[in-house]
């Protein structure tokens, strides 16, 4: 059993599942708890290392996107996230910095969108059509602004 579990948790399939940040499941497939940010970070870095030999650029883009998703899902800022995951790996730190920069850019775009919407005085659907946006994107930006 120990060998089987060891082989399973080192498999790419398992690591990719952990890197996705999905909930941990019990033996019946029912969600049990969230995966800890440090486990997600470790899985992302391990999958990145494995993929880097095939196509380094694609692997880096994948890892950056996963870190964006992981940091956003954790609800932590950069410093709190780094304190939680406690990594000294230069590659991981670089990817985390890139992800945090991307998250900051997304937040700035959302903030600008919300300000433009408020200034327009239009309904969500009218505003979205006026700027060629999806109304769901505008609603999401408004919802995120209200929870922040």
Which sequence ranges carry the predicted segments?
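N-terminal interaction modules that seed assembly of large macromolecular complexes
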Residues: 1-26, 33
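General nucleic-acid-binding
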Residues: 27-82
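Short alpha-helical "recognition helix" segments of helix-turn-helix
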Residues: 81, 126-129
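Positively charged, low-complexity, intrinsically disordered RNA-binding extensions
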Residues: 86-89, 123, 130-131
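Short, Lys/Arg-enriched anionic-surface-contact patches
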Residues: 86-109
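Short, amphipathic alpha-helical "recognition" segments used to contact nucleic acids or chromatin
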Residues: 103-121
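Short, solvent-exposed alpha-helical "recognition" segments
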Residues: 106, 138-148
